[in-house]
Amino acid sequence: YLYVKNPAENGALYFKLNDNWKAVDGFVTVKEGVETGDPGYEDGADYYIEGLFVYVGPSGGDTAARLSTGNTGKDAWTGTLFDEVWVDEGAKKTDLTDETGKVYDMEVTALLHQASDGEGGNLAADADTWAKDQAGKLAGGVDGVGSDEGL
């Protein structure tokens, strides 16, 4: 699970997920109105401003993929969540900078990056609930992100 926090205002920055990733329903802010000719446009694609995303792997299922190298001591990796971030054509400088003029940074946080705890415990068993709880804490009450339980 990865959480993307985007402080830019008015949907000024947005991205499209790479293959094998899926938005966690109820925990993302969708970028509406991306049309032909807009930066990054791809027919039929969904665009996001921020939120919680899960690696589902090539199966394209609804649950987190279990990565395995089949070899203890080796690492297994997902692909990247997104390759580019686009700026909305209607964005203003004030949408992209704070009150001091500093350009906003998007933050990407890995919430669950391994299936076991190193002692044989299964971290993936409650991963969905745990990741949503952590995303809620990171969101800090961002409108349009999360569930009715205060995300």
Task: Outline where the language-model segments fall.
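Surface-exposed, hydrophilic segments of mature proteins
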Residues: 1-151
